[in-house]
């Protein structure tokens, strides 16, 4: 039910006990948990061995500026680089697929189940999204996003489309405050929601993460706590049958929904299967003590479906020609993107 974080680069006994709580289903790793590849491998091994139940181990390893593990890992390009720098659509989709495959392979080689990717927000004006987006035009960005997803799926990693129904149009950063999107309902349904709709119809999204954004012309609650968005639209209209993650309930944007227990209750009632709660250790304890909820059989099955099902050895991955070629190409692309941004921003 709950995905939480840990404080440092080693697992404490107190954290082991918290992770073994019946309501905890997994954890998310951050840059503070990472020093180098050897340390990360030891940390994940410690988690797997010391916690006496299967845990979903996750990370945000999107690429560009949102890449928690860097030293010893491929410098993944920002998603906007594919459309902007590729010579033609065929090259952009090929690069995107390579990136999805390589990212998933590197995570599996460290025994990490899932990277929360890809971002499907249209790149309007939100600084929190920015070059994390594949582009502004849904028709142009969809093939690139789909190619990235196909690369992840080829490796066997579950995919997470975020931030439903679209975070890209608001100026406010939901890490810091609750954003409000005042556009008419038609504007959201005719543009922002299209990448989610198309990829759901093709069965290519294992999970969805809704936004901590209030779409004022549609509902009074943030999408992450909205029955309208999660049950009526996502489940009933779009027929999505996968996992619904809440975005981090520790973010300021979730504060609109009350204290940590109230946020969790509202997210569950709205339709979330798994809840992220990060950087709030006291909040985690409050939820574990105060949340009265037993996950359903369907929610448990959805959770298990996200677990890694393929073993990848790092030395074998590094030795493969496909990996070597992809790493060289994608590192060069990210360097080109940084140079491009320096000249145009």
From Swiss-Prot:
Cell compartment(s), UniProt = Cytoplasm
Instruction: Output the Gene Ontology terms for molecular function.
Output: beta-N-acetylhexosaminidase activity
Listed EC numbers = 3.2.1.52
Q: In which pathway does it act?
A: Cell wall biogenesis; peptidoglycan recycling
Q: Which PROSITE patterns match?
A: GLYCOSYL_HYDROL_F3
Protein's GO biological process: carbohydrate metabolic process; cell division; cell wall organization; peptidoglycan biosynthetic process; peptidoglycan turnover; regulation of cell shape
Q: What span is annotated as the signal peptide, if there is one?
A: none
**Chief localization class?**
cytoplasm
Active site: residue positions: 175, 247
Residues involved in substrate binding: 60, 68, 132, 162-163
| Cellular component terms per the entry's GO annotation | cytoplasm
The record's SUPFAM superfamilies line, in alphabetical order, gives: (Trans)glycosidases
What InterPro entries does this protein map onto?
Beta_hexosaminidase_bac (IPR022956), Glyco_hydro_3_AS (IPR019800), Glyco_hydro_3_N (IPR001764), Glyco_hydro_3_N_sf (IPR036962), Glycoside_hydrolase_SF (IPR017853), NagZ_Beta-hexosaminidase (IPR050226)
One of the Pfam families matching this protein, by short name: Glyco_hydro_3
Which UniProt keywords are given for this protein, alphabetically ordered?
Answer: Cell cycle, Cell division, Cell shape, Cell wall biogenesis/degradation, Cytoplasm, Glycosidase, Hydrolase, Peptidoglycan synthesis
Q: Which residues are annotated as site, described as Important for catalytic activity?
A: 173
The UniProt catalytic activity note for this protein reads: Hydrolysis of terminal non-reducing N-acetyl-D-hexosamine residues in N-acetyl-beta-D-hexosaminides
Q: Which HAMAP family match?
A: NagZ
Question: What is stated as this protein's family in its record?
Answer: Belongs to the glycosyl hydrolase 3 family. NagZ subfamily.
Name the record gives this protein: Beta-hexosaminidase
Name its species.
Actinobacillus pleuropneumoniae serotype 5b (strain L20)
């Amino acid at each position: 039910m709950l995905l939480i974080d840990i404080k440092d680069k080693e697992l404490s006994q107190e954290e082991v006990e918290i992770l073994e709580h019946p309501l905890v289903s997994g954890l998310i790793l951050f840059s503070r948990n990472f020093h180098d590849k050897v340390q990360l491998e030891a940390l994940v091994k410690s988690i797997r061995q010391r916690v006496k139940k299967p845990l979903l181990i996750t990370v945000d390893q999107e690429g560009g500026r949102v890449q928690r593990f860097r030293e010893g890992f491929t410098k993944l390009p920002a998603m906007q680089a594919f459309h902007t720098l590729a010579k033609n659509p065929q090259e952009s989709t090929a690069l995107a697929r390579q990136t999805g495959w390589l990212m998933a392979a590197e995570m599996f080689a460290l025994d990490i189940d899932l990277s929360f990717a890809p971002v499907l927000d249209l790149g309007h004006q939100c600084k929190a999204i920015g070059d994390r987006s594949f582009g502004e035009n849904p028709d142009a960005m969809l093939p690139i996003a789909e190619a990235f997803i196909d690369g992840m799926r080829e490796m066997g990693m579950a995919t997470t489309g975020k931030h439903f129904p679209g975070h890209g149009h608001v100026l406010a950063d939901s890490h810091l405050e609750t954003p409000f999107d005042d556009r008419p309902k038609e504007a959201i349904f005719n543009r922002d929601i299209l990448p989610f709709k198309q990829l759901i119809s093709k069965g290519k999204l294992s999970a969805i993460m809704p936004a901590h954004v209030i779409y004022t012309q549609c509902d009074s609650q943030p999408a992450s706590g909205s029955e309208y968005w999660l049950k009526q639209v996502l489940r009933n209209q779009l027929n999505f049958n996968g996992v619904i993650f809440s975005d981090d309930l520790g973010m300021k944007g979730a504060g609109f929904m009350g204290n940590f227990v109230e946020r969790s209750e509202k997210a569950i009632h709205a339709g979330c299967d798994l809840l992220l709660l990060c950087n709030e250790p006291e909040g985690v304890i409050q939820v574990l003590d105060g949340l009265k909820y037993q996950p359903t059989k369907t929610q448990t099955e959805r959770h298990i479906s996200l677990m890694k099902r393929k073993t990848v050895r790092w030395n074998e991955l590094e030795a493969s020609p496909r990996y070597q070629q992809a790493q060289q190409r994608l590192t060069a692309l990210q360097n080109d993107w940084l140079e491009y941004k320096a000249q145009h921003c």
